[in-house]
Design a protein with these regions (language model features):
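N-terminal carbohydrate-binding accessory modules
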Residues: 1-56
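Hydrophobic faces of well-ordered beta-strands that scaffold small-molecule active sites
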Residues: 25-29, 57-59, 95-99, 158-162, ...
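Aromatic-lined substrate-binding rim segments of carbohydrate-active enzymes
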Residues: 41-108, 183, 187
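Aromatic- and acidic-residue-enriched segments that line the glycan-binding/catalytic groove
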Residues: 71-79, 90, 101-125, 132, ...
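Catalytic-core region of carbohydrate-active enzymes that cleave or remodel glycosidic bonds
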Residues: 83-86, 93, 176, 181-194, ...
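Active-site neighborhood of glycoside hydrolase catalytic domains
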Residues: 129-199
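Aromatic-rich peripheral "rim/lid" segments of glycoside hydrolase catalytic domains that contact
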Residues: 274-316, 320
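Non-catalytic C-terminal accessory domains or segments of carbohydrate-active enzymes
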Residues: 302-856, 862, 868-902
Length: 902
């Protein structure tokens, strides 16, 4: 798999994809490069996904991040699609490209650009105005994608997906016409790989007799909303408990038993919804409970995915399976369900066994040929095989799940896995008795009646090795047995000289055989050795450029003499030396707002009705699509006015605060969602605020209002839910009807580095208080914790220096903690990048990942916190500290990411 410049053919039949007429089981992980704003780390994530068994990545490309204005499409810097696709090809991963135009993906407006909220045309239909913009976007993406098509030898783009994966109802002709137009546009742009939409393969609706089975998203976690109602307030830690290895194994084995051969794990790596990128329902972390966590760390549920990924990649029998028998059957013990499949070409048989009870079951499986009872853990599932070729020998049956089978050098290697403490048993068909060497003390074996029987307790002593030689074949077979934890240290890798298998390190990133030296790169966490089964001719081994003395072990491997040391302890600095400055001068009646936009429109494309007789106050209509928005209303004579009712519309956890002549009137915020409202995209409310009697006077008065809109809802075809108003909707007064002249101001024009989602309309953002080069020497020096009781905005800044070694890959987070009764929010800016929003009294997120590249691992860093408090309680920050999430010796070279410009 490479960009070789040659022509290739991609097709499918009812069994699988056909790549150059060879069957392929696609094992794809969804990855969001836009949620990792450090392009160097894209390679790190891709290498980890490939090493853990994935052969493809499913890549959404969000229109909104790339298009700050109509007709403008930016693919530079952290938006460099060409770089990502090139890196994926270099890392030997196929790409399923998903340019939308609508994505969902818990993105602001589902991935539709902010400017589209104020434009004519009904989204996701055949409306000509919408299609004009959508086709222009697809054309911009396709101009890059066409250079990376696998069919043309330019890259590894193997499949192309339209829209968000949802099917189109048959009774919605506008939506169906819209999909057909998008498909025609893609084909006109010379995209000649198979195209999928929400109904399956485009042109062959769904999975039918002529189409390969497609799984749109098997397992991989779930999004968690503000407040964490579904997770009990525990956030993604709880999501991981639900989507554990057992859950992931059951989901994927069910898909395999259903003869699915195009698998999509949604989520492989989620990342961080930095800035104002997230949809209204979700908070900053998009960890998702994915198999690769937000901090780029493999999660415990990775074990199940890795084992099956390597299995479908190295055992071609699984690319063509037919149902054998009459569907699911109960075993002799009715607590087990067995699905029986077979490959009609090779005769290999596969059994998927489910235990639907809450207790371990050990029982025989009549009719499978497996001659001993099989153990399946509580609620778990297991894939067993019989009649499977292991290189030059045949597996009669096994009670352990096969993980891989390769031929390397002058030997075959097969790996079998199971839960810790289980006993793995297998039998090989052997007409003549073979020789057997145990490289470890745990395995036992016996030969009788033409079969070699091997029994191994899994997990005792780590990896167990059995060498089978002579007998029916001159080619030795190395049998390896591992429990889940041990299997996570087994790394197969394809090289031009042939496949190899490495055991020991935390990660294998690359392997290259030059002359007689095998050059390995990867990561080491704990003290470990290195063991290699590889092609012929290996005389020497290096690890990350350093020679590794080896000897030939009893299992025909090269074994490191001694051990590589564990990664050294990492010390992170305390955060002190804080500087402080209050903000929101916009609430002062004397503030100069003459350069602000007059809110004088009377019509809107919003789905929110314009109040009768009132101006349009919706922020989007004035070009302010992301982040905080300020309003200032001038009026004459407030005598008799007892209160003001401010109607506003936001996403989840939006808020409004108001001042009259600089005097705080109060704050209103949307409620914390429960499980029933967690998916609600737009929230509306009216803040009824009393006017102090001393402010009910003649003369000019200024009503200042700050709204935090919290992003736009996604939309179904034809609904235009993303066009619901954000910001103020109307203002009404009790006791009078003053004429109000409104002015509005939000975020400045997007700058080059970060694009449209980094900043909103806070005064400090517009003045560059978040930037590393801002001069804060005149700011007040303070210590944390703080307890300011003030309605409005305050900023805190500090600097810290890291001196991590060049061979160290450390994942670092920022942790904020305080009394949960205190009502305030914090925007976190690192070196100018808006890396998240912390809501102290809502949660559930307290630790925010600081991506290397934006974080200077060997240099000075500037941290700025913009604190928005409602004045009802003391407001922090209280505890702010750096947190080490993980550290290994290895990693990838990391280029510094530019800080945003003014």
């Amino acid at each position: 798999m490479c960009a070789d410049g040659g022509r290739h053919h991609v097709a499918f039949d009812r069994h699988s994809l056909l790549v150059d007429d060879r069957r392929l089981v696609l094992w794809s992980a969804e990855m969001h490069p836009f949620r990792l704003p450090s392009p160097s780390l894209w390679r790190d994530v891709l290498q980890k996904l490939r090493a853990h068994g994935f052969n493809a990545v499913d890549v959404p490309v969000p229109w909104n991040l790339h298009s700050p204005a109509p007709g403008v499409h930016d693919f530079t810097g952290v938006r460099d699609l060409n770089r990502f696709l090139s890196t994926a090809a270099e890392e030997q991963l196929y790409v399923v490209l998903r340019p939308g135009p609508y994505l969902g993906a818990d993105l602001d407006a589902g991935g539709l650009p902010g400017w589209l909220t104020a434009a004519a045309g009904t989204a996701r239909t055949d409306d000509p105005e919408y299609l004009r913009h959508a086709e222009e976007w697809l054309g911009a993406v396709d101009a890059i994608a066409v250079r990376h098509l696998f069919t043309a030898g330019g890259g590894t783009v193997l499949l192309y997906r339209l829209e968000d994966g949802s099917p189109v109802p048959a009774d919605d002709p506008a939506a169906r016409a819209h999909r057909a137009r998008l498909y025609a546009k893609v084909r006109a742009d010379r995209i000649d790989v198979p195209v999928l939409d929400g109904d399956g393969w485009f042109g062959d609706r769904g999975t039918g007799p002529r189409t390969a089975g497609f799984s749109a998203g098997a397992g991989g976690g779930a999004a968690d909303p503000w407040g964490g109602a579904p997770s009990g307030g525990e956030g993604y830690a709880r999501v991981r408990e639900v989507h554990d290895a057992v859950h992931e194994r059951r989901r994927r084995l069910t898909a395999l038993a259903d003869r699915i051969t195009v698998h999509h794990t949604g989520m492989g790596f989620g990342g961080t919804s930095w800035g104002w990128l997230p949809g209204p329902g979700v908070y900053t972390s998009y960890d998702y409970g994915a198999v690769l966590g937000e901090g780029r760390l493999p999660a415990p549920n990775m074990a199940a995915v890795q084992q099956l990924g390597h299995l479908v990649r190295t055992v071609p029998d699984l690319a063509r399976l037919e149902e054998a028998g009459d569907g699911p059957r109960r075993a002799a013990d009715g607590r087990l369900t067995v699905r029986h499949l077979a490959n009609p070409d090779t005769g290999a048989r596969v059994y998927v066994v489910h235990n639907d009870t809450d207790e371990e079951v050990r029982a025989p499986l009549p009719g499978t040929g497996i001659e001993v009872p099989v153990t399946v853990a509580a609620g778990d599932a297991k894939l067993l095989a019989a009649g499977l070729r292991l290189g030059h020998r045949t597996l009669a049956w096994t009670t352990a799940q096969p993980m891989l089978s390769i031929s390397t050098g002058r030997q075959d290697v097969a790996v079998f896995v199971g839960r810790h403490g289980e006993s793995a048993q297998l039998a090989l068909d052997c007409e003549r008795q073979p020789g057997v060497d145990r490289a470890d003390t745990e395995p036992a074996w016996a030969y009788e009646r033409g079969r070699l029987n091997v029994v191994v307790p899994l997990g005792e002593g780590g990896l167990s090795r059995v060498l089978v030689k002579d007998g029916d074949s001159e080619t030795p077979l190395v049998l390896l047995f591992a429990d889940d934890e041990t299997a996570l240290r087994l790394w197969p890798y394809e090289t031009p000289a042939g496949p190899l298998l490495v055991y020991g390190p935390a990660l294998l990133r690359s392997a290259e055989l030059r002359d007689s030296t095998l050059h390995l790169t990867g990561d080491v966490g704990i003290e470990t050795g290195v063991e290699v089964w590889g092609p012929r001719g290996i005389a020497e081994v290096t690890w990350n450029g350093e020679p590794v003395p080896t000897y030939v072990g009893r299992a025909r491997s090269r074994v490191m003499e001694g051990l590589m040391p564990a990664v050294r302890a990492v010390a992170l600095p305390a955060l002190d030396g804080w500087r402080f400055r209050t903000e929101n001068p916009e609430s002062d009646p004397d503030f100069d707002d003459s350069a602000w936009t007059v809110a004088g429109r009377t019509t809107s494309h919003s789905t929110t009705p314009v109040p009768e007789g009132g101006p349009v106050l919706f922020a989007d209509d004035y070009g302010f699509h992301h982040g905080d928005v300020w309003y200032r209303g001038r009026m004459e004579d407030t005598r008799g006015i007892r209160s003001v009712a401010l109607s506003y519309s936001t996403g989840t956890q939006g808020l409004l605060m108001a001042w009259l002549d600089g005097r705080p009137l109060g704050t209103h915020r949307m409620p914390v969602p429960d499980e029933d409202t967690a998916g609600q995209g737009t929230w509306t409310a009216t803040a009824r605020l009393d006017v102090p009697e001393e402010l009910r006077t003649p003369g000019e008065h200024v009503l200042s209002v700050l709204v935090r809109p919290m992003q736009h809802a996604g939309t179904a075809p034809g609904e235009d839910a993303h066009k619901a108003a954000r910001g103020l909707v109307a203002a009404e007064f009790t006791g009078g009807t003053p004429a109000v002249e409104w002015r509005i101001r939000g975020a400045a024009e997007p700058e080059r580095v970060c694009g449209p989602y980094n900043n909103g309309g806070l005064y400090g953002e517009r003045r560059g208080w978040h930037l590393p080069d801002h001069d804060d020497r005149r700011w007040r020096t303070v210590d944390l914790p703080r307890a300011e009781r003030r309605q409005g905005v305050a900023w805190y800044r500090t600097r810290f220096r890291l001196g991590l070694g060049p061979d160290l890959d450390a994942s670092v987070g920022l942790t904020l903690e305080d009394d949960p009764e205190r009502a305030y929010r914090v925007q976190i800016f690192l070196n100018g990048w808006n890396l998240g929003q912390y809501v102290n009294d809502v949660g559930p997120q307290h630790t925010f990942v600081l991506p290397n590249g934006i974080l200077r691992a060997r240099g000075s860093n500037t941290l700025a916190l913009a604190v928005l408090s409602d004045g009802t309680t003391p407001a922090g920050p209280h505890t702010v500290r750096l947190t080490l999430l993980d550290a290994v010796r290895g990693g990838v070279p990391v280029e510094p990411v530019d800080s945003p410009e003014r």
